[in-house]
Amino acid sequence: MVTAVAAKEEPVTSFAKDQLRAIIERIERLEEEKKTISDDIRDVYAEAKGNGYDVKALRTIVRMRKQDANERQEQETILETYMHALGML
């Protein structure tokens, strides 16, 4: 026998379950897309390496291009200062 309280909670519970399932499925789909994109990026780096490019330098350039110009300049200045202090420049 279903009580009145249980009958009222059933649609809410069903909605919550459906919503939770949809969220989980979206996350799983996005994780798969992320893996595919990651594999594609790895392939591009492998291609670049095959063409004679230095992958480490390419990764550094990509990381630097993501930075704000002022932040990048500040990091370069600090690096130069340290290198100069160590007699590397």
Swiss-Prot record:
One Pfam family of this chain: GapR_DNA-bd
Q: Which InterPro entries match?
A: GapR-like (IPR018753), GapR-like_DNA-bd (IPR046367)
Instruction: Give an example GO molecular function.
Output: DNA binding
The family this protein is said to belong to: Belongs to the UPF0335 family.
- Could you tell me what this protein is called? UPF0335 protein Nwi_0989
Organism the protein comes from: Nitrobacter winogradskyi (strain ATCC 25391 / DSM 10237 / CIP 104748 / NCIMB 11846 / Nb-255)
